[in-house]
Each structure stands twice: as C-alpha cells, then as structure tokens.
Amino acid sequence: MTYAIVVADATKRYGDFVALDHVDFVVPTGSLTALLGPSGSGKSTLLRTIAGLDQPDTGTITINGRDVTRVPPQRRGIGFVFQHYAAFKHLTVRDNVAFGLKIRKRPKAEIKAKVDNLLQVVGLSGFQSRYPNQLSGGQRQRMALARALAVDPEVLLLDEPFGALDAKVREELRAWLRRLHDEVHVTTVLVTHDQAEALDVADRIAVLHKGRIEQVGSPTDVYDAPANAFVMSFLGAVSTLNGSLVRPHDIRVGRTPNMAVAAADGTAGSTGVLRAVVDRVVVLGFEVRVELTSAATGGAFTAQITRGDAEALALREGDTVYVRATRVPPIAGGVSGVDDAGVERVKVTST
C-alpha cells in the first residue's frame, strides 16, 4: 500500500493546550479518510497542519514522498474546502471554478474544457452563469469543491464542508461526495464531528481525542471492534449491562427470562438475562427507544427495538421486562478506558 500523506510524530501546542500529541498518521493513496472527534480533539489542527496553514512544533509532513513540513500551502499541491465556503461574490459560478486555472495562466481552451467537465461532475452545468448569492448552500459547497478540484490537487482537504447546512442537505451531499470521490479518485481527508457522516462516506476513519489518535480503521472496524470505551461511545449511543458496553440496538427486550440468543459473530459475548422496569417508550419512526431501569441496581439504560417488536410486546411504563445483549463488542481498553466525566459526556448509561 502506498501513502499519499504521512504525518510523523507531529506535536502542536497553543500555550498549555496540547492540540496534537505526537501524532503518527498515514492516508492511503486514493482513499477518503475521515478525521472524527469532538471539539478540541485536534482533528482540524491536524488537517491545517497537513495543509500548511499551521506549522507543527515537532514532526514532519510528507505528501506523495515530498517533505512539505516547511513548504507554504500554495506549493503543497492541495485543494482545501472550508465549512464556510469562500466565493468571489462578483464572479459567476464558471469564473469562480476557473479562478485557480486563470491564476496559473492555463490556455483558454483548457480552462473551458476543464470547467465544463467539473460543472457537469458536481451537477452545476445549468448554473454556470449564476452568482454565488443565487445558489443554495449545498450548491455553493459543490462550487467550492469544483474550484478546489480544478487545479488537479494531489490531495483534497475538507474541513467540515457541510457543517453549516441543514440535516437533510448534509445527508444528500455526503452521498454525493462519496459518488464524486469514486469518480475522481483524489486522495481526500475529511474533518467531521458527525459520526453518521464519517461512517457513511469514508473508506477509513481516524478517531481523535485530546490530541491523540485513538483508532484508525474501516468504518466497520471502528464500529464493531472499537479500540476502547471512548471510541465506542463516540461512535454512537451506549448502555452498560453487567459491566459490558453494548449498543442500545443490540439489546433484546422480552416478557420472559427465556431469552437464548445466538451470537452475531465470533466476537459476540453475553451479558446474561437481566430484569428491568420500563420507564418510558418513545416512538422514533420505524424504531422505538425503550428507557429502562435495572431491577437489581437501579441504574438507567436504553434499548432500541423495532416498531414491530415494540407493538408485539405492548410495552407500557412500569412493566417488568427481561433484557439481554445480542452482541458485546470486544474493547481493548475495557470499560475503565473512560473516566466518570467521560462517561457523562458521551452519554454512557449503566445498570
């Protein structure tokens, strides 16, 4: 495997705050890698360090085999798209996309052909004569991506490009971004705090916390086999049954304690059958969230079941039920990998 980006032992401090703590990070050529983490985790600092917008205090940055640690951003061969799109308001969509090519004094015929192709690729062929204020937020971000791609960057860096858009538009654009990447195959690094976006779009996910990379792997790897409790908790809701972290949708709810469960795979474990009391039943479209209290410990936890299962069980507040985990992911760091404050922050509940 070849790597388009190699970050070696990068450290970055802002006074007493450690933004990057001896980070080692690689991006395979042609991949789309997501940097995922909470605010202050170091994900944007890492991206800006790769871009040359920030300089690491220690360590090196290599792009396609070239040490660019002290090379200015404009000479790194990168395309950069920010959360808040930067557009020339007095230029049309076509001229915005063509701007970088004109600065590089490319032939007019080449510029026209390149811009026409990119506008088609990003779905803006019919908008070339419009101005930025005549576009929707999603269309402006597509224009920004086209402009970044116009100069044939070696790598494309995206800093929460859809963060300022509403949920429905973000969902549409992340599916579009995945299709775009599959078409152009440029090495891409995407910063996001949206777990669903990272799982949906990326080939690989790097989870950051307090300036360190906690885990790097495919979406399936980091979700199904988290390196520690923080990774598991940050990638989705978590409950604790008999000391084991489990996903709410991996908790089976029944009326009787006879709940034999077949292991989902070789890594699945068991928490045994527990008795609980229903506190609240919340219908969420095709799913139902069941808020429960352990009869043994009084601890609160949550199960996520299908609408059909909920209707079959006819759950009501105050009902006594039995629960069992259908799958317990292996966690290298164990439950103790998250301190009490961390558990509260990432909404881990316990029984």
Swiss-Prot record:
GO molecular function per UniProt: ABC-type sulfate transporter activity; ABC-type thiosulfate transporter activity; ATP binding; ATP hydrolysis activity
Major localization class: membrane
Reactions that this protein is recorded to catalyse: sulfate(out) + ATP + H2O = sulfate(in) + ADP + phosphate + H(+); thiosulfate(out) + ATP + H2O = thiosulfate(in) + ADP + phosphate + H(+)
Record membrane topology: Peripheral membrane protein
N-acetylthreonine modified-residue sites: 2
Keyword Membrane: yes
Subcellular locations according to the entry: Cell membrane
Domain ABC transporter as annotated: residue spans: 5-235
Lineage top rank: taxon: Bacteria
Family of the protein in this entry: Belongs to the ABC transporter superfamily. Sulfate/tungstate importer (TC 3.A.1.6) family.
Name this protein carries in UniProt: Sulfate/thiosulfate import ATP-binding protein CysA
